[in-house]
């Protein structure tokens, strides 16, 4: 194996955020109706009381282990997922399940659980460390590579990254030449998967920044070849600059949302879409060498996005499915809230967010996530696969929601 690039997680230059500072998954559905499931909701009746730092850390271990065990136990019987997405959810190398593994592997860096580690390793071996190749350029289908390469980092097994490297070499030799505007919808091979538009040959939608860039970065790290992250870094910033709103400090899901308004006349910034991007930045920074020339640029983007998100938490501790229009969907939405809580907690733990307000918001967010977990470990209030702020029921649950809470737990377990 090539010389490993050093992975450094360091305390980063502190720029405090004032209390008043400003601070959307991959899918097919879009619903413009307002959820009416708001009359004295149960989630408002059982809010957790304030916890000590020790209790927060303990709760992170308890919650993460419970939800990880529950989720793994459901594989092969995902009856609770709508039939329209059940078969895809059962595919370990499709983005839905891959998003769970991103959270799980981050948790396994905190909690050294040999049974869960063996599960991840055996799943990966059973797939021969393969990517889905029906959509060779599609970011969603590169997400599982993060888990394969993580196994190389943990075990030294070079076989785990070889198929990803082979495919990424092909992409570098056949770079897509399309713009980032979401235009024509095209069918893919068997019809089991889809493109929303030809621009998805690149990373033209918010979700993509969570799914793919870190895979390319990790590949550079384990091979010692910078060409993979050079490509990913360039593509990340092309998309980030295109979708980020300087006015709001938030990300549009894709170009179709630039001028879109909700029923209440507000701009449409999808909670989970922003969660995908916001969570991607700490994940990238954790793996990015300290001296990399793009490092400060990622940190500055993180600060801008965090400043906006800190202002948008609901009184119950969640982030709205429609960030600028909390009346669009008034119930909790845990996947976006989990990703955002993770990102903010990471900023506090790494000395970027230094004010008490940020810490209080993170603790409130964690308590809200904790309240959304069933006694059996099921993660409730998770918006199903989509691309817009859609209604959510308590019984709605999906693998990426579990992954988001695991990410949050990985930071709350270090809380000070």
Which residue ranges define each predicted feature?
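C-terminal motif of bacterial Sec signal peptides marking the signal peptidase cleavage site
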Residues: 23-25
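Extended ligand-binding clefts on enzyme/binding-domain cores
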Residues: 206-209, 214-323, 330-341, 353-382, ...
């Amino acid at each position: 194996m090539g010389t490993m690039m050093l992975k450094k997680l360091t305390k980063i230059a502190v720029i405090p955020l004032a209390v008043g500072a400003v601070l959307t998954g991959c899918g097919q559905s879009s619903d413009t109706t307002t959820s009416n499931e708001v009359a004295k909701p149960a989630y408002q009746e059982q809010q957790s009381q304030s916890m000590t730092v020790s209790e927060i850390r303990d709760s992170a271990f308890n919650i993460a282990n419970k939800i990880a065990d529950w989720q793994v136990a459901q594989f092969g019987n995902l009856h609770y997922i709508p039939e329209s997405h059940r078969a895809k959810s059962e595919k370990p190398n499709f983005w839905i399940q891959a998003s769970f593994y991103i959270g799980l592997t981050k948790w396994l860096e905190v909690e050294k659980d040999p049974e869960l580690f063996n599960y991840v390793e055996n799943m990966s071996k059973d797939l021969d460390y393969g990517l889905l190749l029906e959509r060779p350029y599609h970011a969603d289908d590169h997400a599982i590579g993060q888990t394969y390469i993580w196994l190389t980092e943990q075990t030294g097994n070079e076989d785990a990254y070889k198929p990803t490297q082979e495919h990424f070499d092909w992409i570098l030799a056949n770079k897509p030449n399309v713009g980032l505007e979401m235009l024509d919808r095209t069918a893919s091979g068997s019809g089991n998967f889809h493109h929303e538009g030809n621009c998805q040959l690149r990373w033209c939608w918010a979700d993509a920044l969570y799914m793919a860039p870190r895979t390319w970065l990790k590949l550079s790290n384990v091979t010692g070849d910078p060409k993979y992250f050079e490509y990913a870094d360039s593509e990340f910033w092309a998309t980030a600059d295109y979708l980020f709103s300087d006015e709001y400090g938030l990300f549009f899901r894709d170009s179709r949302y630039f001028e879109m308004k909700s029923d209440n006349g507000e701009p449409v910034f999808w909670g989970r879409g922003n969660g995908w991007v916001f969570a991607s930045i700490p994940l990238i920074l954790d793996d990015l060498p300290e001296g990399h020339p793009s490092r400060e640029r990622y940190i500055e983007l993180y600060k801008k996005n965090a400043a906006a998100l800190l202002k948008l938490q609901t009184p119950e501790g969640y982030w709205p499915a429609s960030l600028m229009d909390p009346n669009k969907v008034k119930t909790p939405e845990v996947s976006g809230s989990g990703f955002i809580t993770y990102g903010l907690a990471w900023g506090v733990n790494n000395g970027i967010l230094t004010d008490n307000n940020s810490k209080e918001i993170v603790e409130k967010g964690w308590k809200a996530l904790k309240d959304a977990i069933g006694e059996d470990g099921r993660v409730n209030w998770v918006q199903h696969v989509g691309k817009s702020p859609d209604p959510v029921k308590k019984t709605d649950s999906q693998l990426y929601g579990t992954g988001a809470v695991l990410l949050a737990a990985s930071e709350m377990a270090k809380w000070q």
